[in-house]
Design a protein with these regions (language model features):
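Juxtamembrane extramembrane loops of integral membrane proteins
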Residues: 28-114, 120, 162, 582, ...
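Soluble non-transmembrane domains of integral membrane proteins
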Residues: 78, 83-335
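Short linear motifs in intrinsically disordered/low-complexity regions
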Residues: 8, 33, 59, 72, ...
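Helix-loop-helix
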Residues: 1-49, 95, 180, 189-193, ...
Length: 608
């Protein structure tokens, strides 16, 4: 269950789908320590960088640090800087001696829009810090301490201990466990003998901060799906605002995800976090197309001393935001991916995702989208048939409706009563097209949610589209058009053309006379292709490909139904025969007519 907040982009998308629905309704109605070493294995290489000796007088530094931190001052004196680099099957990681934290985390098997390896941590864009208070009230941060590395190759993993020790034996350590396969790694935060120096009454504060790199050619599109999400017990998921700055304090958190659209950094604590301050800041703007970062995320929460020492274990996931990959891990991490809420999410998880995975296992990704579209349209063909029959009936009744509108143009209630009477005598129900339209709505919105987060489409090309997860630009404009962009994408143009012709077919087939006082729905429907063109120009080309093929197939289905399956003359004759039959009382029309009469009486009584 997700706890949703206002999302402007999903709101715009839902408005578009609502317009489509309106149109349809309208026309249908600790480890052993080893000395620093260089290790080479089949999985990769682990190296310790050459020491960088800090050319500062040790005695002067010692005096300065002791003055600042008392007995703990030696932890802040740089002797030499030793960074340890480890390569596994799935990532390269570098841990630096200053702060004992990760300075580089790189996914070599994936590339960004500049064909460079995906970096989740680099160039000081991340910080992992523990703030502690001494007995005499001094504040110290691990990011300022200097740690010595102790590396062990255990066969299936690398175990790295980064330790900052006092001469008397007390120490603070980060113990890293990097498996040689997969995207998980563990960190244990430990202290030993520090209870005589640290104030155990003031809980240490863990501060995890990341400034997210831009990885996609469209920073605006990527930023829509770059989000701070977090999970509770019982699969409940919540998130911070996508825009501006948002800071909240939450309790009982099971995991925290810094989702960078197609890549995520996820923190999984050993036990639910009692209380955490969560912050998200949007750094990108539509005009700043060359920005390096998209958002900044930060989490701060207290740790707990055990017998005066720290012994906290954390698990991190740094890898692709892929539904199947996350689903195979513990903790329901796949719920961090916005597959859609309610029935839309169920459709994606249990229908479209398995179907697309099956099709793409033996077809190219573009062809898989086309075949999936064909399957969806064939499944919806009974709905299309029902809609078309409703159109034919409304077309037959159009002249009679015009006569009623002209005859009772000054009496809305009487006009509506006569219209409903006509429907009843003709055996036509103006609401018969509503159910087919409502059935299709979950499919529309589910696919609208599915394609933008489908990791399998990333970097997959089809025809002129280099990446089905991004827009398919065929022309760079060199300037920015508001709400459109600085480029021209072809699939949205094709989809808009298909929607235009589909609109021509349906409105031409069954455009009912405009009711007085009502907006001209024909004009509104002709705006839909233009809206599609602008809205989808920066969207995933895979989604535009789906809508293009879907509308083409719908047009073909309607032509087949019209020219092969349905006999218009029989439908005409049936309606004319029904119109001649005696009027029946009761039913929906009678109840509606009675309700309208009562409303008119109350209205007149109110005027008196």
């Amino acid at each position: 269950m997700e706890e949703k907040k206002f999302d402007p982009y999903q709101f715009i998308g839902f408005i578009l789908i609502a317009v489509i629905l309106t149109w349809m309704l309208y026309r249908n109605g600790p480890a052993d320590e080893a000395a620093p070493a260089q290790v080479t294995t089949e999985q990769g290489s682990t190296t310790t960088s050459s020491p960088e000796v800090v050319q500062v007088s040790d005695s002067i530094l010692q005096q300065q640090k002791v003055a600042a931190f008392g007995d703990l001052g030696s932890l802040f004196v740089p002797k030499q800087i030793e960074n340890v680099r480890i390569a596994t099957d799935n990532f390269n990681v570098e841990v630096q001696s200053k702060g004992g934290q990760i300075a580089l985390f790189q996914l070599d098997e994936f590339e960004n829009y500049e064909d460079a390896p995906i970096r989740l941590i680099d160039e000081s864009n991340a910080d992992f810090n523990i703030t502690m208070t001494t007995l005499d009230g001094r504040i110290m941060n691990t990011r300022e301490m200097y740690f010595s590395p102790y590396l062990t190759d255990t066969g299936d993993a690398y175990h790295l201990v980064m330790k900052a020790s006092l001469s008397s034996g007390e120490y603070i350590a980060f113990e890293y466990h990097f498996p040689k396969k997969g995207y998980l790694h563990q960190v244990a935060i430990k202290t030993e003998g520090m209870q005589r120096l640290l104030n155990s009454g003031t809980p240490p504060q863990l501060d995890w901060k990341t400034t997210v790199f831009r990885n996609s050619i469209s920073i605006d599109y990527e930023n829509r799906y770059t989000e701070f999400t977090f999970g509770y017990e019982e699969d409940r998921v919540d998130y911070l605002s996508l825009s501006g700055e948002d800071q909240e304090t939450r309790e009982g958190i099971r995991w925290i995800s810094y989702r960078q659209h197609f890549f995520s950094a996820i923190l999984i604590p050993e036990a639910p976090i009692s209380s955490a301050t969560l912050t998200s800041v949007n750094l990108a703007s539509d005009e700043a197309l060359e920005e390096k970062f998209t958002k900044s995320f930060e989490t701060v929460y207290p740790l707990t001393f055990t017998s005066g020492n720290l012994n906290t274990k954390l698990t991190f996931y740094y890898g692709p935001t892929d539904y199947k990959t996350l689903q195979n891990l513990e903790g329901d991490l796949e719920t961090s991916i916005p597959m859609g809420w309610g029935i839309f999410g169920w459709i994606n998880k249990f229908i479209f995702l398995p179907l697309f995975e099956f099709l793409s296992s033996f077809l190219s990704y573009g062809i898989a989208i086309i075949v999936m579209t064909l399957i969806v349209r064939l499944a919806m063909s009974p709905v299309t048939y029902k809609s078309y029959v409703s159109q034919i009936k409304m077309k037959v009744l159009r002249p009679d409706i015009e006569v009623i509108n002209n005859k009772y143009k000054d009496d809305a209630v009487k006009r509506q009563q006569e219209t409903m009477s006509l429907y009843s005598r003709a055996g036509a129900n103006p609401m018969s097209g509503c159910i087919p339209a409502l059935i299709q709505l979950p499919v529309f919105y589910a696919l609208f949610s599915f394609f933008p987060v489908a990791f399998v489409l990333r970097d997959k090309s089809f025809l002129w589209a280099d990446d089905l997860s991004s827009y398919d630009s065929i022309l760079e404009l060199g300037f920015n058009i508001p709400f459109y962009g600085d480029h021209v994408s072809l699939f949205p143009i094709l989809a808009s053309i298909a929607i235009f012709f589909y609109t021509q077919m349906t409105t031409g087939q069954q455009a009912m006379p405009q009711q007085p006082g009502m907006p001209n729905m024909k004009i509104i429907m002709y705006l839909m292709p233009l809206m599609m063109l602008f809205f989808f120009n920066n969207y995933a080309s895979g989604l535009s490909l789906y809508y293009f093929v879907s509308n083409l197939l719908t047009i073909l289905l309607m032509l087949v139904i019209k020219n092969v399956i349905i006999d218009d003359n029989k439908i005409h004759a049936k309606i004319e025969e029904n119109k001649k039959k005696p009027k029946k009382s009761g039913g929906f029309s009678a109840r509606l007519q009675k309700a309208m009469e009562e409303a008119e009486k109350q209205k007149k009584a109110g005027r008196k």
